[in-house]
A protein has these predicted regions:
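Short acidic loop-to-helix transition motifs that present clustered carboxylates
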Residues: 134, 444-448
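Conserved small/polar residues in nucleotide/adenosyl-binding loops
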Residues: 451-454
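Polybasic/polar functional segments that serve as interface/processing modules
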Residues: 464-466
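A short acidic/basic microdomain associated with nuclease active sites
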Residues: 429-445
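Phosphate-binding site recognition
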Residues: 1-418, 433-437
Length: 467
């Protein structure tokens, strides 16, 4: 049992012991069907906190020779498959998190990755193998000795691609990946490859290290969509179990429409259930900085589209021009596509339209607006709670003043006196209202029912009905 070579099942055991656990073990059925096939290389690119690393820990526990996971899987959905034990703990597993190496070894990261794995190989195989040979040859030698194939798992595989501007380093890294996944030796020793990242695979000229991977993204993930994020039925069951209001949960954390499935942010839902409180659990400076980076880019129509989405609207996005690289953003569509992959926008692939998925993400946008050219918008949003209070108190004069302020602020970036702009103004004027009220855009004619404060924070979903 090692850290990188044949790891334990500690990660999956911890997940199973957590306060909130949702069974995603049927993902392993999908992977088992791809062992030793042309489809054995899987690339999963999803936003952070959507269960990529949890899945990697589960894959460790299932395939690794370094542990016995019989009891961990015996009461799971996977166990309903009669031969689910066929591949359990039968493979040599290598598991790497590239981001942890990047933090410590930027200058010689590839050398260090190999050193750390080779150290564990040496403990296991001692003088049986010539460890001075190329890394893929060493893997082949281990396979020759043991007759046990490898399952290779790489978390944050794209960390170097996203963070390095050194083309030579990127080239060497891709050569290293080629040795793992496309060399002649890998045709024998590799049973399965599972790599995760934030962005889809970047097409780099003259590089073919990863062109044999099957990609699953925030745009399209069939047939494994349901395994990354919580499905609506799973969230309903959690709400019953933890006595939490489903509609509020939906408004706060739903909105990711992937392959027609409504997917929820699993980390935030779990936190809300455990803490019995609806709040933004995506509060960190990196998320605010990421949003701010893209919404302040100087591309025609970008500010209008952001404003429309902040007000609950949807905008058309051409995702095909995005080069899967944050450093080559060249248009409004590229900027919005980047936000989709980062999880800050939802996307309807049928209609090819994007939207702010839920109230949690809306609050992250609110924080991101505090600097730069959006500061005037941020100042207007800061008056939303006051407007809400004055509306409740029936202070018509102050309400009129605040609505006028909102009108002057928001119509400066929208079509003045356009009907949709006026609707946008009212929505933005009451931007923080969803934290306290059910939001109903239009009441049916003659319906005199009032919208009331709900102490349980029961909210309507932000996802546009036309999405």
């Amino acid at each position: 049992m090692g850290i990188y070579f044949n790891p334990s099942n500690a990660s999956f055991r911890q997940a199973r012991n957590s306060m909130v656990y949702v069974d995603k073990t049927n993902l392993l059925n999908f992977l088992n069907r791809r062992l030793f096939t042309d489809d054995k290389c899987i690339a999963l690119s999803h936003a952070r906190r959507f269960g990529k690393s949890h899945a990697a820990g589960m894959i460790d526990a299932y395939y690794s020779l370094g542990c016995d996971s019989t009891k961990l899987f015996e009461d799971t959905k996977l166990a309903s498959n009669a031969d689910y034990k066929k591949h359990m703990n039968k493979y040599n597993v290598i598991h790497l998190d590239i981001s942890s190496f990047w933090d410590d070894f930027k200058d010689n990261i590839i050398k260090k990755i190999q050193e750390y794995i080779l150290d564990e190989f040496k403990k296991e195989f001692k003088n049986k193998i010539d460890f001075t040979k190329k890394f893929n040859v060493v893997l082949m030698s281990i396979y020759d000795i043991t007759n046990i194939p490898f399952v290779i798992i790489i978390d944050e595989w794209d960390c170097i691609i996203r963070n390095s501007h050194d083309e030579n380093l990127i080239h060497k890294y891709l050569q290293f990946l080629h040795s793992l996944f496309k060399s002649e030796e890998s045709k024998s020793f590799l049973a399965l490859a599972y790599i995760t990242g934030i962005l889809p695979i970047k097409k780099i000229k003259d590089e073919s290290a990863l062109n044999n991977f099957r990609e699953y993204t925030m745009l399209k993930s069939k047939p494994i969509t349901e395994y990354y994020g919580f499905t609506e039925d799973e969230v309903k069951n959690l709400c019953k179990q933890y006595d939490m209001d489903f509609d509020s949960t939906k408004a706060w954390y739903n909105g990711y429409l992937i392959d027609g499935m409504h997917m929820y942010n699993p980390n935030s839902v779990s936190m809300a259930m455990d803490r019995q409180d609806f709040d933004s659990y995506w509060k960190n400076t990196s998320s605010f900085a990421s949003i701010n980076t893209f919404i302040t880019m100087n591309y025609a129509g970008l500010k209008d589209d952001i404003m429309a989405m902040l007000a609950g609207g949807i905008v058309r996005v051409n995702t095909n021009t995005f080069k899967n690289d944050f450093s080559t953003i060249a248009s409004k569509d590229d900027a919005l596509t980047a936000l989709i992959h980062l999880g800050y926008l939802g996307y309807d692939s049928d209609r090819k339209k994007a939207f702010i998925p839920n109230y949690e993400v809306a609050t992250a946008f609110e924080a991101a607006l505090q600097t730069g050219e959006w500061s005037d918008i941020a100042r207007a949003i800061s008056t939303c709670d006051e407007l809400l209070d004055e509306t409740i108190e029936g202070n018509a004069e102050r309400v009129s003043e605040l609505i006028e302020l909102a009108h002057d602020t928001y119509t400066s970036v929208l079509k003045y006196n356009d009907e949709n702009s006026l609707s946008c103004v009212l929505t933005m004027a009451y931007f923080t209202a969803p934290a306290y009220y059910n939001i109903i855009r239009e009441m049916p004619a003659g319906d005199r029912k009032s919208t009331r404060l709900n102490s349980s924070h029961r909210l309507e979903s932000r996802m546009p009905s036309s999405a």
